[in-house]
């Protein structure tokens, strides 16, 4: 059984509605590199290819390691009162962590310095600190889903609960290259850098 078939018990075509295409987040994602050989610009992996590959591995883990049961138990234990819409949004938040985790690699300094990407002339953005990408990825994720939550028909209590899940996921995205320490420091850094998502 495929990941989409397991998810909410609906067929694959409907599940794809919950996955946000990277093209809806980043204009011309084919211009951005995710990885290259030792930062020398050779053999670049395009960001879209990287996201697709990561998602494929997530599907494999979901199927073979029974992630669905883990997340169902997590949701039932921490937020048993969520409506059907709230549950769908909860799972959309989870699935799309994979899609958003490296979106911050659109940082012009990351592209020019780390990736040696010469596909376009990159213009540095002053409020971005060096070549960092993880906190920017978290800000883009937060910005996208905050709007979705606010536009939803969820009750105020459900929105508050979903906001907590969203913030935890943004924290995980921001730390996906390191350890998960310093949540308070993340909140401070995130509040200072939330303006980044508005730029993009």
Show the residue positions of the predicted features.
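Accessory nucleic-acid engagement/destabilization modules that flank
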Residues: 3, 7-11, 18, 23-200
């Amino acid at each position: 059984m495929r990941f989409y078939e397991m998810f909410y018990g609906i067929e694959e075509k409907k599940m794809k509605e919950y996955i946000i295409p990277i093209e809806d987040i980043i204009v011309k994602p084919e211009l951005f590199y995710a990885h290259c050989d030792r930062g020398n610009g050779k053999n670049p992996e395009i960001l879209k290819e990287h996201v697709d590959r990561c998602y494929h591995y997530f599907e494999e883990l979901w199927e073979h390691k029974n992630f669905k049961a883990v997340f169902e138990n997590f949701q039932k234990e921490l937020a048993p009162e969520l409506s059907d819409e709230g549950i769908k949004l909860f799972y959309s938040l989870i699935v799309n962590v994979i899609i958003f985790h490296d979106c911050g690699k659109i940082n012009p300094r990351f592209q020019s310095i780390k990736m040696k990407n010469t596909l376009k002339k990159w213009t540095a953005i002053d409020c971005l600190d060096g070549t960092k990408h993880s906190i920017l990825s978290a800000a883009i994720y937060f910005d996208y889903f905050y709007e979705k939550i606010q536009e939803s028909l969820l009750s105020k209590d459900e929105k508050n609960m979903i906001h907590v899940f969203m913030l935890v996921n943004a924290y995980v995205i921001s730390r996906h290259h390191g350890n998960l320490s310093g949540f308070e420091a993340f909140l401070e850094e995130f509040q200072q850098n939330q303006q980044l998502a508005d730029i993009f």
